Design a protein with these regions (language model features):
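A short, N-terminal "cap"/entry segment at the start of jelly-roll beta-barrel domains
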Residues: 1-42, 122-124
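Conserved short histidine dyad/triad with adjacent acidic residue
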Residues: 44-61, 95
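Short beta-strand His + acidic residue motifs that chelate non-heme Fe in jelly-roll/DSBH
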Residues: 56-58, 76-77, 98-105
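Glycine- and acidic-residue-biased ligand/ion/polar-headgroup-sensing regions
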Residues: 63-74, 79
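Short acidic-glycine-tyrosine-enriched beta hairpin
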Residues: 80-96
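A short hydrophobic beta-strand segment most commonly corresponding to one strand
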Residues: 92, 106-124
């Protein structure tokens, strides 16, 4: 068993930050790895933190993805709908579903992401 406190996990900058439509300023996102590579045969689990107006851009996963919003407010969208998400919300995205998620224009957002170990994301 392992217990971690989110504030104690290093925040590592990530590439691939996308702007919300119509915004041209800087955006950033970072990752706090909860389950270290090799510590689980089944899951990847991290916190991803988004600056205001930052999204993942469109992508798919070859496994289901679960998001647990830990702070702030954001949006999640697929090709059919866009929904606001807030701290405490949980999102289930099916394998192969084209989607994006990120912070709103007026808020940062953090979420825990859970995917299958060895799974892949494809952007675009």
């Amino acid at each position: 068993m392992k217990v971690v406190t989110l504030k104690d996990i290093p925040n590592v900058p990530m590439e691939g930050a996308e702007r919300i439509e119509g915004y041209t300023g800087p955006v950033s996102r970072s990752r706090q790895t909860i389950i270290q590579p090799g510590d689980s045969a089944n899951y990847n689990c991290s916190v991803v933190n988004f600056s205001q107006r930052c999204t993942t851009g469109w992508h798919t996963h070859n496994c289901d993805q679960v998001l647990v919003v830990t702070s702030g407010s954001g949006m999640v969208a697929n090709e059919h709908e866009q929904r606001e998400i807030n701290a405490g919300d949980v999102v289930h995205i099916k394998a192969g579903e084209r989607h994006w998620h990120g912070a709103k224009a007026d808020s940062t957002m953090g979420h825990i992401t859970i995917t299958a170990f060895g799974s892949q994301a494809t952007h675009g």
